[in-house]
Amino acid sequence: MSFLQNFHISPGQTIRSTRGFKWNTANAANNAGSVSPTKATPHNNTINGNNNNANTINNRADFTNNPVNGYNESDHGRMSPVLTTPKRHAPPPEQLQNVTDFNYTPSHQKPFLQPQAGTTVTTHQDIKQIVEMTLGSEGVLNQAVKLPRGEDENEWLAVHCVDFYNQINMLYGSITEFCSPQTCPRMIATNEYEYLWAFQKGQPPVSVSAPKYVECLMRWCQDQFDDESLFPSKVTGTFPEGFIQRVIQPILRRLFRVYAHIYCHHFNEILELNLQTVLNTSFRHFCLFAQEFELLRPADFGPLLELVMELRDR
């Protein structure tokens, strides 16, 4: 699911027509604000050969300037019919420079991204500063992750696990056009960490592209969520033994790797899409939840350990 598939046009941008018609404003300032087709060549009809401004008619359309049935003003003393329209006040010249053809059909499929000034990210320190600016110091999330009184812990963990899956799936979906096998041939977080995927049990994990890794991860998570023996959907269902260690921790450990890849390799795109607040809030929620129930070890955070510690201390 990809975000922001809207089409935008830069201020002052003109677009070419694809339907064989284009408005002409070359003579608009000289024709009292009237707009004529490109084939029109307005001229003055002079009566009795006298070039008198008082007797000059400023015609609006091409067909009104030509004689009707071969007759003109001097033939048999008759004048050809002339169609006139009320005069309009001419708009300021600066408003006549660019014309937008609303019949244009866009052929591109990429959104117009307007990067914000000063948002180039090169180091983890830059990411930390942006996170600090987009997150407040209120302890709302700190209280939100705590187990409510009387709530089953396994149920609480299962609900949040599915919630984090949906959040990460949505966040990654927003940058899929920037993350491809060509741009991200390996699932890495900086050059120091690479995450491998094992397609079958008993076989060693192999290196895959970032999109392939995320695709396999999301399918693997969905298969577990659909397994009634692991995530019972009925109230009478029970969770398996070792649910936290065998199910929850492996899922969250692997979901975290998507956060790491986005932060280390696609944070500029997140800034261009103006999703940094959404990403930082989701990531902080994830870290606080993992800390509250001791679900991840420091080694699991890899290159984002410093950022995780910063979020925990806020």
Swiss-Prot record:
GO cellular component terms listed in the entry, alphabetical order: cellular bud neck; chromosome, centromeric region; cytoplasm; mitotic spindle pole body; nuclear periphery; nucleus; serine/threonine protein kinase complex; Sid2-Mob1 complex
Keyword Mitochondrion: no
InterPro entries: MOB_kinase_act_fam (IPR005301), MOB_kinase_act_sf (IPR036703)
Annotated positions of the Phosphoserine modification: 34, 36, 80, 229
Ranges of Low complexity composition bias in the record: 44-55
Signal peptide residue numbers: none
SMART domains to which the protein is assigned, alphabetical: Mob1_phocein
One GO term of the biological process aspect: cell division
Compartments in which it is found: Cytoplasm; Nucleus; Cytoplasm, Cytoskeleton, Microtubule organizing center, Spindle pole body; Bud neck
GO molecular function: kinase regulator activity; metal ion binding; protein kinase activator activity
Keyword Cell membrane among UniProt keywords: no
PTM comment: Phosphorylated by CDC15.
Keywords assigned: Cell cycle, Cell division, Centromere, Chromosome, Cytoplasm, Cytoskeleton, Metal-binding, Nucleus, Phosphoprotein, Zinc
Residues that bind Zn(2+): 179, 184, 261, 266
Coarse class of the protein's main subcellular location: cytoplasm
Chain spans, region Disordered: 29-55
Superkingdom of the organism of origin: Eukaryota
Gene3D superfamilies: MOB kinase activator
Composition bias type Polar residues, residue spans: 29-43
Family: Belongs to the MOB1/phocein family.
Additional comment: Present with 5020 molecules/cell in log phase SD medium.
Record function comment: Functions as an activator subunit for the DBF2 protein kinase. Binds to DBF2, which is required for the phosphorylation and activation of DBF2 by the upstream kinase CDC15 in late anaphase. DBF2-MOB1 is part of the mitotic exit network (MEN) signaling cascade, which regulates release from the nucleus and activity of phosphatase CDC14. Required for inactivation of mitotic cyclin-dependent kinase for exit from mitosis, cytokinesis and G1 gene transcription.
Quaternary structure annotation from Swiss-Prot or TrEMBL: Interacts with protein kinase DBF2 to form the MEN DBF2-MOB1 kinase complex.
Name of the protein this chain belongs to: DBF2 kinase activator protein MOB1
Lineage of the organism: Eukaryota, Fungi, Dikarya, Ascomycota, Saccharomycotina
